[in-house]
Amino acid sequence: MVSILTQLNDHFAQALEGQFPSDVTLPTPLVVPASNPKFGDFQCNIALPLAKQLGQPPRAIAMEIVDKVNLSEICEPLTIAGPGFINIKLLPDYLGEQLIKLQQNQQLGVSLVKGEERIVVDFSSPNIAKEMHVGHLRSTIIGDCLARVLEFRGYDVLRLNHVGDWGTQFGMLITYLKEVYPEALVTADALDIGDLVTFYKQAKQRFDQDEQFRETSRQAVVALQAGDAKSIKAWQLLCEQSRREFQLIYDCLDITIEERGESFYNPFLPGVVELLQEKDLLVEDNGAQCVFLDGFTNKDGDRLPLIVQKSDGGYNYATTDLAALNYRLNTDGAEKIIYVTDAGQANHFAQFFQVAEKAGILTDPTQVVHVPFGLVKGEDGKKLKTRAGDTIRLKDLLTEAVTRARQDLETRLTAEERSETEEFKTEVAQRVGIGAVKYADLSQNRTSDYVFSFDKMLALQGNTAPYMLYAYARIQSISREGGIDFAQMDSGEIVLTEPTELVLAKNLLQFADVIETVEISLLPNRLCDYLYELSKVFNRFYENCPVLKASDPQRGSRLLLCDLTARTLKLGLSLLGIPVLDRM
């Protein structure tokens, strides 16, 4: 199904083909959504830039364009405002026809891409032996949302979890556990993740203060890298313990992701160094092998190195990133790779991408994109922490969200004098609590910091998940009250006469354009903004237009509008990773 915006642009392009001198370039896009609804639904603003090329008044050019374009079956007669803005107002009958097509379309108007382009989305990426914290929330749910949108568009998406499962910290941890709890290095489940994190902190403290411990830890890393059987077994047990804990979080958030940690790329690291050597990119600096790039300097103006091999022969994470990129392009067959990490890593990715280009690993038309995000802050405006000043564990945050959602539900049930089963209350609390956390994050422009507030995210009013879920549940109550199975409804006819019907119709027809915008911008908040506006528009429609008590054809038409709204909300929320509820 072709979106209305695309149809209008096609009509204008066909009508204006060959109408201007060959040296004149038509601005694009020809048609855009109206900046103000009072002027219409769409507008064509090209007369002003064309005036400079043609040396003619923009209003005269606008009049010429209006004469050439025939949109009589789509919109009311075109009007010209101001110096040459062409306003387009869609016909109600045309809107009704488009809605019927939308109702018959499983994808709700979103077209599938041609061919199966493979896109890698690299997200989440926690570190072994550490608990996932609130910082991992953003990468995990933003990455999941982008993967869902791309999958829905028909791309072949490979979701990868680049966990930190290798490096000095393992030598440090293994050395410490040999002293204080050797059983953990030979027995599965000897530790829970909390104990492991505590031991990690204690090991780090020893590493920073004790030279002998530091040297023993380095030897443990060497043994691990050399494939020593006992060291490998200990490492595998530690990784497996963390992996199980990560999976509990992923199950709670409904995240599907394939783990491929840093250790996977170990065999390829010497080859990366050799390649950079062959390309004459390496410079020795204090015994380390580095790449120096233009445009990356410290405060004194000295060029910053990208270290690929340390002075002790070990490799840096930049080396692993280069090996991973090479593998993803040449073995996984990726045509685009999206990295979802905090904005603090922007400099690293800019350097890494530039080195990859210079080394010939990254070539056109392959795309690599860093998708940065800001911090999660507390209501005091500072980085979100516990009262004790520690980083908030993601597990605790999600548990509290569900607990608070349950408390809100119990309060509401008491006020409404409703009685519900334990199963109902558990499901509603889980979906509302987790959905609220996800939506609160995704509804922010990801490049910005945002303030985390349980009270705001769980509110039934405003731009929140509960508000969207309630709008969906309200439509399901119409279905139950009227004994109507939306899935069995005939397409029928959509009659749009009331102002709120027209506004709802126009909003429903914007879904495909919104999904395209999210795909291009990689900004999930664009979808959240749309769903919030759709929910508000539907609620105004519901308050002003009787549905079940209306007479046909209005009754059938309004039921179809309700069904389309419910389907759009359900699909849109599912792309955010939020399941709906028939009752709340």
UniProtKB/Swiss-Prot annotation:
Keyword Transmembrane helix among record annotations: no
An example Gene Ontology biological process: arginyl-tRNA aminoacylation
PROSITE patterns linked to this entry: AA_TRNA_LIGASE_I
Nucleotide-binding as UniProt keyword: yes
Substrates-to-products reaction catalysed: tRNA(Arg) + L-arginine + ATP = L-arginyl-tRNA(Arg) + AMP + diphosphate
A GO molecular-function annotation: arginine-tRNA ligase activity
Motif ('HIGH' region): 126-136
Subcellular location: Cytoplasm
Primary location group: cytoplasm
Pfam families xrefs: Arg_tRNA_synt_N, DALR_1, tRNA-synt_1d
Gene3D superfamilies tied to this protein: Arginyl tRNA synthetase N-terminal domain, HUPs, Isoleucyl-tRNA Synthetase, Domain 1
Subunit: Monomer.
PANTHER family tied to this protein: ARGININE--TRNA LIGASE, CYTOPLASMIC, ARGINYL-TRNA SYNTHETASE
Protein name: Arginine--tRNA ligase
